[in-house]
């Protein structure tokens, strides 16, 4: 029987914990990352912390800066534009594929997630989690493993953006209607319309994100592992 390496399991736990802290802003962009302080705070040895930090660095969530050391990565204005531009392309493709390949059960799941959004109006934390679930369900409904991998990589980068764009006034009703349009097109097996609806959704999300960054608004959404709203 193969024995489990305690440091390996602790490293996995530390990785998940630190990623959650980056997502909810506990470790915000630009924050110093000190291995010994994290080990002490999490009450574990430095070995699993080192393993977790290596993984986060490989994902681009931690970077090394001269004269500063390791810090949580920051996305500048151009990086945000590039991130959303790529998401528009990939999510549009995911919606197109979903219209072709999604099962009836997967379409029903998407529809139920959209319905649940309406039941949680005003609860930014719940809405952000539902939004995350909706997009993940959309990615998987496309049934393309390579597209899924690319989208999950972008999803990791999204957690560096901080709070939800639902902090932008009137964003939720628009985003909700956009989700409905995506699901409707997928249910009707209309790849062209599904892609167009998804692309429009991401373009509008990009505008909301840039507005959020310009205004320095702060979301009520805290203490959640869900990445920023799309």
Model-derived features with residue positions:
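Short linear motifs at protein or domain termini
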Residues: 1-100, 211-230
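Short amphipathic alpha-helical segments with heptad-repeat character
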Residues: 80-88, 187, 195, 199
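Active-site loop of classical SDR/Rossmann-like NAD(P)-dependent oxidoreductases
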Residues: 171-173
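Conserved amphipathic alpha-helical segments that form helical-bundle/coiled-coil interaction surfaces
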Residues: 100-164, 175-185, 193-203, 207
């Amino acid at each position: 029987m193969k024995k489990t390496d305690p440091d390996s399991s602790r490293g996995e736990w530390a990785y998940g914990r630190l990623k959650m802290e980056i997502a909810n802003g506990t470790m915000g962009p630009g924050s110093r990352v000190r291995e010994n302080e994290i080990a002490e705070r999490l009450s574990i040895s430095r070995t699993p912390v080192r393993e977790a930090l290596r993984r986060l660095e490989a994902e681009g969530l931690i970077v090394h800066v001269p004269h500063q050391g390791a810090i949580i990565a920051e996305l500048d204005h151009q990086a945000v534009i590039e991130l959303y531009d790529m998401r528009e392309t990939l999510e549009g493709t995911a919606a197109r594929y979903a219209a072709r390949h999604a099962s009836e059960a997967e379409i029903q799941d998407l529809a139920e997630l959209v319905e649940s959004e309406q039941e949680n109006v005003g609860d930014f934390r719940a809405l952000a989690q539902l939004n995350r679930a909706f997009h993940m369900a959309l990615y998987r409904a496309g049934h393309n493993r390579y597209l899924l991998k690319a989208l999950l990589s972008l999803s990791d980068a999204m957690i560096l953006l901080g709070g939800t764009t639902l902090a932008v006034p009137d964003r939720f009703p628009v985003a909700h209607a956009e989700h409905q349009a995506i699901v409707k097109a997928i249910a009707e097996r209309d790849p062209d319309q599904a892609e167009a609806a998804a692309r429009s959704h991401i373009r509008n999300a990009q505008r909301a994100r840039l507005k959020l960054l310009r205004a320095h608004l702060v979301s009520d959404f805290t203490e959640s592992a869900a990445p920023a709203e799309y």
